[in-house]
Amino acid sequence: MKVAIANRQRRHPIGTPRLRKVAERILSALGYPDSELSVVITGDLGIRRVNREYLHKDRPTNVISFAMAEGEFGALNPAMLGDVIISADTAAREAEEGGVSFWSRLCFLLLHGILHITGYDHERSGEAEARRMEAKEREIFAILEREGLV
């Protein structure tokens, strides 16, 4: 399992080895132990650029995922799952608003992004699929909590 993490912001301290362990545990729980994943932690400006360029939405968001299995060459390397981009700025605001720690919110957004690149959806596939994704989020987040990763 290879998880590459790039922290491209400095405002919010992030332990990348610790975040890598969380990502590896999520992938293992989902049945992707031999996969590859790229995680980028950025700020609102960085994620806004990505959101504008690729999704045509000119605003920051909390997490964006790009699945490598989608598109013309998706089958070339099935072990390469894709990219998860998280705004640490938005994660920090959401953590404060939700009364949870920054780390907890960051890990939840990582989980949410990984679920998207492994085929889960809550936006385009209807209410039943959204409930299925939320149930999987609760299940795996509980594992992370139980194992002291969150």
UniProtKB/Swiss-Prot annotation:
SUPFAM superfamilies found in the cross-reference section: Metalloproteases ('zincins'), catalytic domain (SSF55486)
Major subcellular location class: cytoplasm
Cited Pfam families: YbeY
Keyword terms, alphabetized: Cytoplasm, Endonuclease, Hydrolase, Metal-binding, Nuclease, Ribosome biogenesis, rRNA processing, Zinc
GO CC terms in record: cytoplasm
Gene Ontology MF term list: metalloendopeptidase activity; RNA endonuclease activity; zinc ion binding
EC number(s) per entry: 3.1.-.-
Binding site for Zn(2+): 112, 116, 122
Superkingdom in the source lineage: Bacteria
InterPro entries: MetalPrtase_cat_dom_sf_prd, YbeY
Subcellular location: Cytoplasm
CC cofactor note: Binds 1 zinc ion.
One BP annotation, GO: rRNA processing
Named cofactor requirement(s): Zn(2+)
Keyword Zinc: yes
Protein family (similarity comment): Belongs to the endoribonuclease YbeY family.
PANTHER family: ENDORIBONUCLEASE YBEY, CHLOROPLASTIC (PTHR46986:SF1)
HAMAP family referenced in this protein's UniProt entry, alphabetically: Endoribonucl_YbeY (MF_00009)
Role noted for this protein: Single strand-specific metallo-endoribonuclease involved in late-stage 70S ribosome quality control and in maturation of the 3' terminus of the 16S rRNA.
Protein name: Endoribonuclease YbeY
